Amino acid sequence: MSDQIKFIMDSLNKEPFRKNYNLITFDSLEPMQLLQVLSDVLAEIDPKQLVDIREEMPEQTAKRMLSLLGILKYKPSGNATDMSTFRQGLVIGSKPVIYPVLHWLLQRTNELKKRAYLARFLIKLEVPSEFLQDETVADTNKQYEELMEAFKTLHKEYEQLKISGFSTAEIRKDISAMEEEKDQLIKRVEHLKKRVETAQNHQWMLKIARQLRVEKEREEYLAQQKQEQKNQLFHAVQRLQRVQNQLKSMRQAAADAKPESLMKRLEEEIKFNLYMVTEKFPKELENKKKELHFLQKVVSEPAMGHSDLLELESKINEINTEINQLIEKKMMRNEPIEGKLSLYRQQASIISRKKEAKAEELQEAKEKLASLEREASVKRNQTREFDGTEVLKGDEFKRYVNKLRSKSTVFKKKHQIIAELKAEFGLLQRTEELLKQRHENIQQQLQTMEEKKGISGYSYTQEELERVSALKSEVDEMKGRTLDDMSEMVKKLYSLVSEKKSALASVIKELRQLRQKYQELTQECDEKKSQYDSCAAGLESNRSKLEQEVRRLREECLQEESRYHYTNCMIKNLEVQLRRATDEMKAYISSDQQEKRKAIREQYTKNTAEQENLGKKLREKQKVIRESHGPNMKQAKMWRDLEQLMECKKQCFLKQQSQTSIGQVIQEGGEDRLIL
């Protein structure tokens, strides 16, 4: 800390500050003086900060310094609580806060000067988005941004030129070299002219060469124009694709949507736009006009000092107290009449505030949605340029994902069924093979037994008869089964219809009960909601009344406190006057002449006598001046006449000297006569 203070003191003692501090005087600086030192250091970095803080409010001083420190990117150590401590310390001029700031500023003064200079031109003026809807404002803002970019480019070039080390001597040397080269080129041109003039048809050759140069320039211009048209065509194709995608998305949205939903959405948009145009925007415009009027009024008025501001604050407090008293009188007078209306008014004000808040939220959401759509379109264009494929939009992507999920589940189920069927097929195939082998063995055994008994072919004939009888029985059974199935199906249908009727009867009865219960619950919900709204409005009104009462009591407390301070000041003044009167009485009663001379009465008596003597002398002087005024005026007139006479003689003498003599001047007895 001591090294920090020493560095600050040494830097302040040097140019351009020249404070002549030592450790004792610097450490004994008061908070106001320390803030003035900080303001002087900031003024060295930014000349706009050259302010006498005694003529500035503390809040304005802190705001000005904090804004400049923010531009200079000063970061005090600590968290949010330390930041609040830093702001408070900057307001009151705390040394633990001011010393690190001074040390940081004085360490990098030149760098911060450059940063403050650039901040004047590179801090962008934020324009509200609703103002940018105006074409004039948008064009001006665009021009402003272009000028800012041009300034950045020029500043970079300036810095590069400073780093490159070009000097005026080198530039002059280059200029002289270019002039010499120009002279050489002129000589070469003259030499070539002389050589060409000797050739035949040199004028025609020069004309052809000139035409060739013009055509080459025209060819370059056409190539450049061709490239520009290619770029325009590319941008137009991109724009066409973007518009086609928008049209496709709109058609899909229109195809997916119903007319009722579209009409409902359009009605909501119309209501919202109507509210914005008829209520919100006129209010904001009126508020902005009032604010502009007040600001113009403030700008037109002369600058006010601290005393004027205190006087205005006292007037504002008096007017506020009068307004509160009038409101209280009005409330007391109109309480029985407007008791019921106040509740509805407060409810209406609460609803209007909620409506405005929701409108602002909706406007912000729309702006955010528009920005996200612009960003998404940019990303889609980048993706299309990268791999040439279309990017699915939100709804399309959701449908694609859902379709893919459903197909995936179906695929998994089918795959599982196929695996089960494969396993079952393998098992059945093995069973079939075993049964075939067993059947073949049994057939071989049967044939051998028939051959042994001498009745070969009997089993085959028996099998054929059984097969034919089985087929006949199957056909008969199928016919009977068909009739039975038809009659059974009719019975089932009748029974199913009766069951559904009975089941639906209970369901319909239950549905009626549920509908009735729903209506009762809806009615109860509406009643509870109205009770809640009225209770909330009543609580809101009570809260507003309590806030007004608290505000009024605080104002009364402030008034009583100011009245208390005023009374104390008056008491002190009266005590001083009483002390003076007591001292005067003591001096007047005292027998000491020296004490009597100190009395104010004696001093006033003495001053009165002196003034009377002075008035008497002045009256005598006035009398003398009045008596001598007439002769003096006469004497002054005689002197003026004498002066005119001498001037006339002078003119005559000069005329006599300059012209030829046309007469004779005779002097006799102190008189001059001119004889022509």
UniProtKB/Swiss-Prot annotation:
Keyword Cytoplasm applies: yes
Protein name (record): Intraflagellar transport protein 81 homolog
Natural source organism: Homo sapiens (Human)
Lineage of origin: Eukaryota, Metazoa, Chordata, Craniata, Vertebrata
GO cellular component: centriole; centrosome; ciliary basal body; ciliary tip; cilium; cytoplasm; intraciliary transport particle B; motile cilium
Keyword Coiled coil: yes
Coiled coil: 132-258, 306-389, 416-456, 490-622
Domain notes: The CH (calponin-homology)-like region shows high similarity to a CH (calponin-homology) domain and mediates binding to the globular domain of tubulin.
Gene: IFT81
Disease link: Short-rib thoracic dysplasia 19 with or without polydactyly: A form of short-rib thoracic dysplasia, a group of autosomal recessive ciliopathies that are characterized by a constricted thoracic cage, short ribs, shortened tubular bones, and a 'trident' appearance of the acetabular roof. Polydactyly is variably present. Non-skeletal involvement can include cleft lip/palate as well as anomalies of major organs such as the brain, eye, heart, kidneys, liver, pancreas, intestines, and genitalia.
Tissue: Highly expressed in testis, moderately in ovary, heart, liver, skeletal muscle, kidney and pancreas, low in prostate, brain, placenta and lung and not detected in spleen, thymus, small intestine and colon. Isoform CDV-1R is abundantly expressed in testis.
